[in-house]
UniProtKB/Swiss-Prot annotation:
GO cellular component: TAT protein transport complex
Disordered: region residues: 45-69
Membrane topology: Single-pass membrane protein
Organism: Dickeya chrysanthemi (strain Ech1591)
Protein name: Probable Sec-independent protein translocase protein TatE
GO BP term, example: protein transport by the Tat complex
Length: 69
């Protein structure tokens, strides 16, 4: 097993273009890019909210226990 050569990749790419067509591949690439961009935006928006909510929480008050008399 030699692995995948450049010639094999070109043949696979040509078959994909023949099966799906260039317009379908172009729209698929745009959709994939938009999905990745939306995912990154959601991750970046979520991180500051998590940090601020952790800072907003106040620790519970410390209670004192006294021995029974």
């Amino acid at each position: 097993m030699e692995g995948i050569s450049i010639a094999k990749l070109l043949v696979i790419g040509a078959l994909i273009v023949l099966l799906f067509g260039t317009n379908k591949l172009r729209s698929l690439g745009g959709d994939l890019g938009a999905a990745i961009k939306g995912f990154k935006k959601a991750m970046n928006d979520d991180q500051p909210a998590a940090k601020s909510s952790a800072q907003d929480e106040h620790p519970a008050a410390i209670s004192e226990t006294r021995p029974k008399e």
